[in-house]
From Swiss-Prot:
Native organism: Rotavirus A (strain RVA/Human/United Kingdom/A28/1987/G10P[X])
GO CC list: extracellular region; host caveola; host cell rough endoplasmic reticulum membrane; membrane
Record keyword Chaperone present: no
Entry keyword set: Activation of host autophagy by virus, Calcium, Enterotoxin, Glycoprotein, Host endoplasmic reticulum, Host membrane, Host-virus interaction, Ion channel, Ion transport, Membrane, Metal-binding, Secreted, Signal-anchor, Toxin, Transmembrane, Transmembrane helix, Transport, Viral ion channel, Virulence
Entry protein name: Non-structural glycoprotein 4
Length: 175
Protein backbone atom coordinates (compact mmCIF):
# COMPACT_ATOMS: atom_id res chain seq x y z
CA UNK A 1 0.00 0.00 0.00
CA UNK A 2 2.71 2.38 -1.01
CA UNK A 3 1.78 5.98 -1.53
CA UNK A 4 -1.78 5.37 -0.33
CA UNK A 5 -2.14 8.69 1.43
CA UNK A 6 0.55 10.61 -0.37
CA UNK A 7 -1.34 13.70 -1.47
CA UNK A 8 1.73 15.31 -2.97
CA UNK A 9 2.24 12.33 -5.26
CA UNK A 10 -1.36 12.50 -6.45
CA UNK A 11 -1.19 16.25 -7.02
CA UNK A 12 2.11 15.95 -8.86
CA UNK A 13 0.65 13.30 -11.18
CA UNK A 14 -2.38 15.51 -11.90
CA UNK A 15 -0.09 18.47 -12.58
CA UNK A 16 2.08 16.28 -14.83
CA UNK A 17 -1.01 15.14 -16.75
CA UNK A 18 -2.25 18.70 -17.16
CA UNK A 19 1.16 19.99 -18.33
CA UNK A 20 1.48 17.05 -20.74
CA UNK A 21 -1.94 17.76 -22.16
CA UNK A 22 -1.07 21.46 -22.47
CA UNK A 23 2.10 20.66 -24.40
CA UNK A 24 0.37 18.16 -26.67
CA UNK A 25 -2.63 20.32 -27.35
CA UNK A 26 -1.09 23.79 -27.69
CA UNK A 27 -3.79 24.88 -30.06
CA UNK A 28 -5.63 27.72 -28.26
CA UNK A 29 -8.78 26.94 -30.20
CA UNK A 30 -9.17 23.56 -28.50
CA UNK A 31 -12.64 23.92 -26.94
CA UNK A 32 -12.91 20.45 -25.40
CA UNK A 33 -9.69 20.52 -23.40
CA UNK A 34 -11.31 21.30 -20.00
CA UNK A 35 -13.75 18.41 -20.46
CA UNK A 36 -10.99 15.99 -21.42
CA UNK A 37 -8.87 17.13 -18.48
CA UNK A 38 -11.73 16.72 -16.00
CA UNK A 39 -12.58 13.23 -17.33
CA UNK A 40 -8.96 12.18 -17.04
CA UNK A 41 -8.80 13.64 -13.54
CA UNK A 42 -11.90 11.70 -12.49
CA UNK A 43 -10.52 8.49 -13.99
CA UNK A 44 -7.17 8.97 -12.27
CA UNK A 45 -8.87 9.70 -8.94
CA UNK A 46 -11.04 6.60 -9.30
CA UNK A 47 -7.93 4.59 -10.11
CA UNK A 48 -6.03 5.95 -7.12
CA UNK A 49 -8.99 5.44 -4.78
CA UNK A 50 -10.21 2.06 -5.97
CA UNK A 51 -6.95 0.11 -6.17
CA UNK A 52 -5.95 0.52 -2.48
CA UNK A 53 -9.57 0.10 -1.38
CA UNK A 54 -9.86 -3.16 -3.29
CA UNK A 55 -6.51 -4.36 -1.90
CA UNK A 56 -7.68 -3.70 1.65
CA UNK A 57 -11.06 -5.28 0.97
CA UNK A 58 -9.50 -8.38 -0.58
CA UNK A 59 -7.16 -8.84 2.38
CA UNK A 60 -9.84 -8.37 5.03
CA UNK A 61 -12.75 -10.18 3.42
CA UNK A 62 -13.15 -13.88 2.86
CA UNK A 63 -15.06 -13.70 -0.41
CA UNK A 64 -12.87 -11.66 -2.70
CA UNK A 65 -14.89 -12.24 -5.86
CA UNK A 66 -17.99 -10.59 -4.41
CA UNK A 67 -15.96 -7.62 -3.18
CA UNK A 68 -14.33 -7.09 -6.59
CA UNK A 69 -17.70 -7.44 -8.31
CA UNK A 70 -19.33 -5.00 -5.89
CA UNK A 71 -16.50 -2.44 -6.36
CA UNK A 72 -16.67 -2.68 -10.15
CA UNK A 73 -20.46 -2.38 -10.17
CA UNK A 74 -20.25 0.63 -7.85
CA UNK A 75 -17.65 2.31 -10.08
CA UNK A 76 -19.75 1.73 -13.21
CA UNK A 77 -22.89 3.00 -11.47
CA UNK A 78 -21.00 6.13 -10.41
CA UNK A 79 -19.81 6.69 -13.98
CA UNK A 80 -23.35 6.19 -15.28
CA UNK A 81 -24.67 8.75 -12.78
CA UNK A 82 -21.96 11.21 -13.82
CA UNK A 83 -22.96 10.68 -17.45
CA UNK A 84 -26.58 11.45 -16.57
CA UNK A 85 -28.13 8.00 -16.88
CA UNK A 86 -30.84 7.00 -14.43
CA UNK A 87 -30.39 3.26 -14.99
CA UNK A 88 -28.04 1.27 -12.84
CA UNK A 89 -26.21 -2.00 -13.16
CA UNK A 90 -27.46 -4.67 -10.79
CA UNK A 91 -25.72 -7.86 -9.82
CA UNK A 92 -27.26 -11.30 -9.62
CA UNK A 93 -27.12 -11.08 -5.84
CA UNK A 94 -29.31 -7.98 -5.84
CA UNK A 95 -31.72 -9.59 -8.29
CA UNK A 96 -31.85 -12.72 -6.12
CA UNK A 97 -32.49 -10.59 -3.02
CA UNK A 98 -35.36 -8.83 -4.79
CA UNK A 99 -36.75 -12.15 -6.02
CA UNK A 100 -36.55 -13.58 -2.50
CA UNK A 101 -38.36 -10.52 -1.16
CA UNK A 102 -41.09 -10.90 -3.81
CA UNK A 103 -41.45 -14.64 -3.13
CA UNK A 104 -41.64 -14.01 0.63
CA UNK A 105 -44.37 -11.39 0.10
CA UNK A 106 -46.29 -13.79 -2.17
CA UNK A 107 -46.07 -16.55 0.46
CA UNK A 108 -47.33 -14.14 3.12
CA UNK A 109 -50.29 -13.17 0.91
CA UNK A 110 -51.06 -16.83 0.11
CA UNK A 111 -51.08 -17.64 3.83
CA UNK A 112 -53.42 -14.70 4.46
CA UNK A 113 -55.73 -15.84 1.65
CA UNK A 114 -55.68 -19.39 3.06
CA UNK A 115 -56.59 -18.11 6.54
CA UNK A 116 -59.39 -15.95 5.16
CA UNK A 117 -60.71 -18.82 3.06
CA UNK A 118 -60.68 -21.12 6.09
CA UNK A 119 -62.55 -18.52 8.14
CA UNK A 120 -65.13 -18.06 5.40
CA UNK A 121 -65.67 -21.82 5.15
CA UNK A 122 -66.13 -22.01 8.93
CA UNK A 123 -68.63 -19.14 8.79
CA UNK A 124 -70.59 -20.85 6.01
CA UNK A 125 -70.71 -24.09 8.02
CA UNK A 126 -71.89 -22.18 11.09
CA UNK A 127 -74.61 -20.45 9.08
CA UNK A 128 -75.71 -23.83 7.68
CA UNK A 129 -75.99 -25.27 11.20
CA UNK A 130 -77.98 -22.24 12.35
CA UNK A 131 -80.27 -22.55 9.32
CA UNK A 132 -80.78 -26.26 9.96
CA UNK A 133 -81.79 -25.55 13.55
CA UNK A 134 -84.20 -22.83 12.50
CA UNK A 135 -85.86 -24.96 9.83
CA UNK A 136 -89.48 -25.92 10.61
CA UNK A 137 -89.87 -29.65 10.36
CA UNK A 138 -93.23 -31.29 9.87
CA UNK A 139 -94.00 -33.98 12.41
CA UNK A 140 -96.74 -36.59 12.43
CA UNK A 141 -97.69 -36.24 16.04
CA UNK A 142 -96.60 -33.96 18.81
CA UNK A 143 -95.35 -35.65 21.94
CA UNK A 144 -96.87 -33.61 24.75
CA UNK A 145 -95.26 -35.63 27.52
CA UNK A 146 -92.23 -33.40 27.29
CA UNK A 147 -94.37 -30.31 27.58
CA UNK A 148 -96.31 -31.36 30.71
CA UNK A 149 -93.44 -33.20 32.33
CA UNK A 150 -95.27 -36.55 32.45
CA UNK A 151 -92.76 -38.91 30.95
CA UNK A 152 -93.07 -41.48 33.72
CA UNK A 153 -96.84 -41.48 34.04
CA UNK A 154 -98.25 -45.00 34.40
CA UNK A 155 -101.47 -46.08 32.88
CA UNK A 156 -104.35 -47.70 34.73
CA UNK A 157 -103.26 -51.18 33.74
CA UNK A 158 -99.77 -50.59 35.11
CA UNK A 159 -100.89 -49.90 38.73
CA UNK A 160 -100.76 -52.84 41.10
CA UNK A 161 -104.28 -52.49 42.38
CA UNK A 162 -105.64 -51.44 39.04
CA UNK A 163 -106.70 -48.02 40.35
CA UNK A 164 -104.84 -44.75 40.18
CA UNK A 165 -103.82 -43.83 43.74
CA UNK A 166 -103.63 -40.16 42.86
CA UNK A 167 -107.17 -39.95 41.62
CA UNK A 168 -109.42 -38.06 44.04
CA UNK A 169 -111.89 -40.17 45.98
CA UNK A 170 -115.24 -39.23 47.30
CA UNK A 171 -114.92 -38.48 50.92
CA UNK A 172 -117.89 -37.87 53.19
CA UNK A 173 -117.32 -35.93 56.27
CA UNK A 174 -119.51 -35.64 59.30
CA UNK A 175 -120.93 -32.30 60.10
Amino acid sequence: MEKLTDLNYTLSVITLMNSTLHTILEDPGMAYFPYIASVLTVLFTLHRASIPTMKIALKTSKCSYKVVKYCIVTIFNTLLKLAGYKEQITTKDEIEKQMDRVVKEMRRQFEMIDKLTTREIEQVELLKRIYDKLMVRATDGIDMTKEINQKNVKTLEEWKSGKNPYEPKEVTAAM
